């Protein structure tokens, strides 16, 4: 592999990182996902949880309020990092495809609207598999292709894939699918006030294997 070429392409992707900022829509949806999918898992309060692509910390806030303290948010956005740290969260500035986290140490990775930002999702998923403990869980939420807002063309979106492709990648990376679902929401075009649907894929995955 030509490492210098890789660095060049990788730096292009890094240059397109953007701040999530405050979003009431994403905040309310994150709360719903936590209540409907994460809390029923009944993870022990000492569970080590990573929020990859943590944004301004909506998930971290909910988990902290529920009594979880072993939480780390991952982001490359300096603004989002600052917001999260102001709320008392531990945040690490790193690429979520190359985690400075020990092997088999994490109990849950929460990857809501982050995996579509990876130029190489198979590599990213292999990295998640590496850091997850045997039998540990990965939550993935991603936009669907060819939706009204055409997420394929958003800045820093590289992997807006169909359901079957995601399922194939999960299997290849060593994950067992526990939940394979979707959620459709009604959004409003702020310019025209027209309503339109938007669908996201929801997956809860479990690590297969012991190392």
Regions found by a protein language model. Name each.
Residues 1-99, 108, 125, 165, ...:
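Conserved N-terminal segment of class I S-adenosyl-L-methionine
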Residues 140-142:
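Acidic carboxylate diad motif detector
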Residues 186-211:
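Core SAM-dependent methyltransferase catalytic element
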Residues 119-123, 150:
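Short N-terminal helix/helix-N-cap motif within the alpha/beta-hydrolase-1
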Residues 175-186:
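Conserved S-adenosyl-L-methionine
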Residues 150-165:
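Acceptor-substrate binding/catalytic loop of class I
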Residues 122-137:
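A short glycine-rich, Lys/Arg-flanked "PGG" loop and its adjoining helix->strand segment in the class I
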Residues 111-114:
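A short beta-strand submotif of the Rossmann-like class I SAM-dependent methyltransferase core
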